[in-house]
Each structure stands twice: as C-alpha cells, then as structure tokens.
Amino acid sequence: MSKIFILSAGTSPDSYNNQLAKHLSNYFDKKGLENVLFDNLYSDIPFLLDTHDDVPEKILEMRKSLEVSEKIIIFSPVYNGGFLAHLKNTLDWLSLAYDENRYSALFKEKKVAVVTTVKGAGGNAQKAFEILSMQLSNYDLQVFEKFHLITKSEHQNEKSILNNRDVIESLNSLSLIHI
C-alpha cells in the first residue's frame, strides 16, 4: 500500500486541525498504514513570488513523500468562508514543474479528502470547502465529494475520530482504512 500524505494547514502547532491530523497519523501508525504528516505550513515556506525562486527544503521533502503517495488528506481551518493563504501557497509550490515533471504532476489523479475543524458551529465551512475543492480540482486532484466538519467537542482525541461516522465513511471510501 502506498503512503498516505497528510497536510495540516492549522494556524499554530496546537491548532485544532494540527491536533486532529496528529491523532489520525498516530491511528494510521497503529494500523500499520504508512503515512507522513506535514504541518506548520506557515513556517519555512516563503510565499511563491517567482517560479524561479529556490525551492524551500520543506517543499523538497513534501515532493519526495508525494511521489510515493496515492492518497492525500488535507486538514484545513475555515476563516471568513475560505481557506488560508499558507495552504494555497504550499499547494502552489508543490504544483510547480520540476525535473522531468510537468505542472501538477505530483497531484495528477491522486485522491484527496478534506477535513475541517472549527471552534464554533462551522457556518462558513461548506462554502470554504467548495472554494478549496475547486482549487484542488485545478491541480488535477480527485476530490472526495463530501468534506468533514468537526467541531471542537468532536475532536479532542483519537477515539473521537473513530466515533465520527462521516470521517470514517470517507476514509473507507478512499480505501485508506477499513473499520
């Protein structure tokens, strides 16, 4: 089985999205599912201003992992009905052509699921998912049609993830896990 690439766009090391991504990564480890988690996307990845800029080391590490991954899970917070700039910046860096690879080669036909955690009720989450989903499709990713909104009370620990039927259903549909 290929590696599962987990990308968390949380706003701090202790953000809800990063916490949940770490819980899921630990769960996959226990199940023997090879995965890699990248978070803190706001750190060590400068904004892409010119496609001729030197590629950040963190992006080079992500490329290596994406090359051997077929499935991606993105944890994305919602702000003002959209997703954060550091997530798009990271995706833009990863979409650049390199070596013999063309634009978006790392993403081509890979399956991606989106999970969103919020402090409140998540009223803007659906619109944010639609915007992010459209962007992910532009990168040639196969976006799972259903996104997952997890409120603060639902993601305090690994057990909470396993009790969230929608998340488990999507992960099963992506053939990531079978519970």
Predicted features and spans:
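Residue-level detector of flexible, active-site-proximal loop/helix-junction positions
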Residues: 42-44, 119, 150
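Short, histidine-centered active-site or binding-site loop motifs used for metal coordination
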Residues: 8-10, 116-118, 153-154
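Flexible, gly/pro- and Lys/Arg-enriched active-site loops
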Residues: 96-108
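Short, glycine-/small-residue-rich phosphate/pyrophosphate-handling segment
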Residues: 107-148
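N-terminal beta1-alpha1-beta2 submodule of the flavodoxin-like/Rossmannoid cofactor-binding fold
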Residues: 1-99, 143, 158-177
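Short helix/strand-capping connector loops at secondary-structure junctions
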Residues: 148-159
